[in-house]
Structures are given as C-alpha cells and as structure tokens.
C-alpha cells in the first residue's frame, strides 16, 4: 500500500492496524454520514482516514532556514546555529527525521538555506590556513588550499544528506518522504 513502509517491521504493522481502526472510527463516528456514503460510493475520496483520529499533520514545508539560523530545540535540547556546512547538513537531516516521525506524508525542505553555511566553512578554512601559513604562502596558494578543503566539505555534506535521508526510518516504519 505504501512503498516507503517495510511491512515486515513491527512498527509498520502497528501503524497499519492503527490505520484500520482510525478508518473505521472516522467512517462510523467522525464524518457526517453523507460524506462517508459518498466516499463508499466513489463520489469523492476522503483522504488520510487512516490518520484522521490523530492530531498530526500530513505534509509540511519545514522552515529550515529559521531553524538553522536561529537554532532549534530537538528532544528538549537546544541546537545552536551550525558553524559549518557539514554540521548544517547533519542538523538538517536530524530535523527531517524528527518532523517525519511526528507527522505522516511528505515534507519539503528548501536546501538553498545551506549555502550560507558553505560560506561559513570557507571563512573558517581561510582563517585557519592564513593563521598557520599566512606569511609563508602566496594568496593564490592559500585560496587553492581553502577551495580544496571546501570541496571536500561540500561533498561530505551532500553525502550526509543523501545517506541519512535514505537510511533513516520514522516511528511508523517509513523512510522520510522528502
């Protein structure tokens, strides 16, 4: 029924059972009779009846820019604004996992907000290299060293995003749908 869910997992099976209970209660007790009847007759489709009894959301746009720029709270712990691209990518995947475990359906994340963290990494690398080699190396060599480290961090950050999103599992046994 849902290709993002592994039906062999107990958490997925529990989610499916809860969904059937929710559909039944939604049909018998929560929806007006004419809506339930129209759904049964195929006149309309009442979407997400399997989650209707719960106060959770279907799909959202995560305000990742605000959460990264101003910090956020996850699991009762304050997460400060990242100081590098790699950390921003890691925090982004943690936010995606937390949101996915507390809703159903997909989520959208605007990755453009990660750009400023690449700039932070650039500035950090440049400062480190200038402090260590500033008067011993020409500026173009310093820039080349900074770019080499920056490209490695960019690659590692994107790899983190890909691996984490593809291997994370939510509480209902589903991979985040991003």
Question: What are the residue ranges of the model-derived segments?
Answer:
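Catalytic alpha/beta active-site cores
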Residues: 1-178
């Amino acid at each position: 029924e849902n290709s993002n869910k592994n039906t062999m997992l107990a958490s997925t099976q529990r989610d499916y059972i809860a969904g059937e209970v929710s559909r039944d209660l939604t049909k018998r007790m929560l929806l007006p009779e004419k809506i339930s009847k129209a759904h049964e007759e195929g006149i309309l489709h009442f979407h997400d009846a399997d989650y209707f009894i719960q106060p959770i959301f279907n799909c959202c746009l995560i305000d990742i820019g605000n959460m990264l720029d101003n910090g956020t709270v996850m699991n009762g712990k304050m997460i400060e604004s990242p100081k590098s691209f790699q950390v921003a990518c890691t925090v982004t995947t943690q936010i995606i996992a937390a949101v996915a475990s507390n809703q159903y359906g997909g989520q959208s994340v605007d990755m453009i907000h990660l750009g400023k963290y690449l700039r932070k990494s650039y500035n950090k690398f440049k400062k480190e290299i200038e402090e260590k080699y500033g008067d011993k190396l020409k500026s173009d060599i310093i820039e080349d060293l900074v770019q080499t480290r920056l490209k490695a961090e960019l690659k590692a950050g994107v790899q983190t995003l890909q691996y984490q999103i593809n291997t994370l599992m939510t509480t209902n046994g589903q991979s985040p749908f991003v």
